[in-house]
């Protein structure tokens, strides 16, 4: 039958019809979206699945929460074929909700409770008849009329059990033909229609190239779009089915940009992307746009720096059924059909048009959805059997006009309903916009027919409309060139990020009304234009405001402009938001415009000094170079044997172990931080870096391995040549060498970060085994070289190496002599943090940390101790940052194992300085709290975190504010992620601080320390070497 429909085409066009119109055949590895997610949750359980600034959820935790939610939904009657209305907002709850619904076998219907109109939400609930409405408590008022439907509050169903059997997945009967989600179209031309999309539709795009866009474990993906927009499913489900990390954007432009600077793959509409410069986002590797026509200027600008995909497809063909990797300078097309899909360009009689001729684009293949919910007539009108496939499958009338380009890609020519009649001629408005975009400097353009006149809209506002008109006349006939123009800073956008043509139309009418006043009349035959700034867009939008529900204000703590001496009367800071608080001027107001001090040295010198050869690496180098000098000297003089080389190995192991021994660390910290504030700053800033002694540990460890390799070679040589070294000594040596090699491999920084648990286990278990083997090897070697006339005991007593082995053995074992199981009192601060209180006769000094465990032979975790002046005991703050912490937040312990003694860390240095800025992000306030509470020196505290009081509780927040009333507490949820370097530099200047100390994650710590040190300001932060 398909061949009969092609009989009117030439032989060449018939061949190209099949070549161009059929996507590649590809195997789809997963039939259901949640099956693909579960595969990655099992393969990479500890990888971050969802990231919302400082809040992170691993695949294992997300899978557990989704399983619990699915079980809860099954209990409410949700099963295969059910539908669940998901009324949430952009947050981790969104992703938990999506996966929980899918695991229960149902389809989700997504709406953003902050955006969706009352009429759309009401219609969708009545039309879809969901079994359950899954929402957040804050949106309770939005579903008050849905009394007959069970409402489950997602934020109140968090699973608090750590019992894995409690969170098992319910039986799964889902197949590829079952619905995955239902998207309600915008309804700009009538009542919103629910499009029924299946699992097979979705996995066909998201689980294979090019639709997977290179998403994989370790790749960060943006979530920028309105969750009701089917394009957002590409972000959300795309990242989950490919094992990537989904990064949720906030509400402010700063938060948007912060996420854009943090991800690898960005999804956007062209309108959303237009204001941004790709040079500001060097991290981005892939950008995909869809939803509206992409201006060539945007495609060329971004395509020069990233893999830039222009995609197209209505909701009915599942997100996008065509994609094109754009090459700057080429024509902007929407590409060809994605794998297992097809595209046909047909005339009004549903016959293929000749290649290159315009026609209506129809889609076929695996992406064609089930149809419209409860609208059989509308479905039958737009979905028809595919005569070209002749296999019973359906094809869909997209309503888009297009033509095949000679390179086999599709040129999008706009909508059928976007054609207008001007002076008797049929004009395609998207073609008019494309002609306007040929004018140099035009970033985006669109055209509308308003009251019989053709209007052109372009950005930016600085454009000269006469230039736009001149460029358009070179491409379009006179009747298809706008006679009136509006140039704007940027186009207004709909909730889905598309250009809001309703507002543009109103702006044009307002401008026309102004023109028609007597004083402003212009000759009708001339082109007229108005330049409008961005602020006018908001005014125009306000003329007919969309229905948007009230957004509750978020709580935050702020510090107002002004200075208060530490220790003065405490400011009363209310824990709830107030109107007065909203009007206060923030201490950081305008900080981004501050002029920062110049860096003190040339780029190469300062990078060498502060990044490549920081003090930690310099200490490492000193130890290693000394060893290598000795190594070369011994090789040159040939004054060595296995016994002497073994002694050097022991000496290095001795140094390495002692640099990790708690009592040694504390002694060194006490000595170096005893330098009084009256001493010159140049001395204090060096002594304060005592926390970098880990460089000595690492240098000695690597040197010991090098010497052990030399010892092994020499011992093997002596054994072969019938020398003193015995076979048993050499055999033990090779075992030790293999174990130390394993320890060194997993201690490599990049591998240590990626496989931290493995690093800990190899360091612990191989270290213990190696210690026992070292003793055996040492005894064997001593016997091999036993002098005549001496007993083994006499030789050992006289051997300095024997005493070194004894000392480092005691050093390793000593903390275990102080192992005990103690009581603790949990104080649950939130679902993100718990505070554990201990009182077993130990009151740590400020700046120390303790080691805690619930399985002492398996793992230990270090936490900063918070001691309250005048009280015995201490507390620690445990915040959600992995499985171990999550377990103890969900099920707080009453007993814990402790060992060793509290050990000093970086903040022991605080008393060395006269005035200091102390910086903490999130739970980093824990290590900072003791220094703050003791009020040892005047200090300015900067604490950035989302929802501070809700996360860390009033007690901790109030105690910080009492000790430091001028503390700057920056709510990242409300204000977005700050430029920490600029903000810290402002506080240093205002407070006249001598130094800065920061407790944060590794990237931010290194960034702030470098930002200060390179400008001559002493700055200190933790070293991640263990």
Curated annotation (Swiss-Prot):
The organism's place on the tree of life at top rank: Eukaryota
Record's keyword annotation contains Nucleotide-binding: yes
Enzyme type, top EC level: oxidoreductase
Binding, NADP(+): 685-688, 769-771, 840
Binding-site residues for AMP, renumbered to this chain: 332-333, 412-415
Chain residue ranges for the region called Adenylation (A) domain: 37-422
Assigned keywords, A-Z: ATP-binding, NADP, Nucleotide-binding, Oxidoreductase
InterPro entries cross-referenced by the UniProt entry: AA_adenyl_dom (IPR010071), Adenylate-forming_domain (IPR052979), AMP-bd_C_sf (IPR045851), AMP-binding_CS (IPR020845), AMP-dep_synth/lig_dom (IPR000873), ANL_N_sf (IPR042099)
EC number: 1.2.1.-
MF terms in GO: ATP binding; oxidoreductase activity
Alphabetical list of Pfam families matching this protein: AMP-binding
Start and end residues of each stretch annotated as Reductase (R) domain: 682-901
Region of interest (Thiolation and peptide carrier (T) domain), ranges: 556-638
Family to which this protein belongs: Belongs to the adenylate-forming reductase family.
Function: Adenylate-forming reductase, a natural product biosynthesis enzyme that resembles non-ribosomal peptide synthetases, yet serves to modify one substrate, rather than to condense two or more building blocks. The A-domain preferentially accepts L-serine, L-alanine and L-valine as substrates. The natural product of the enzyme is not yet known.
Domains as described in the record: Contains three distinct domains: an adenylation (A) domain that activates the substrate amino acid which is subsequently covalently linked as a thioester (aminoacyl-S-PCP) to the 4'-phosphopantetheine prosthetic group of the second domain, the peptidyl carrier protein (PCP) domain, as well as a reductase (R) domain of the ferredoxin-NADP reductase (FNR) type.
Name assigned to this protein: Adenylate-forming reductase 06235
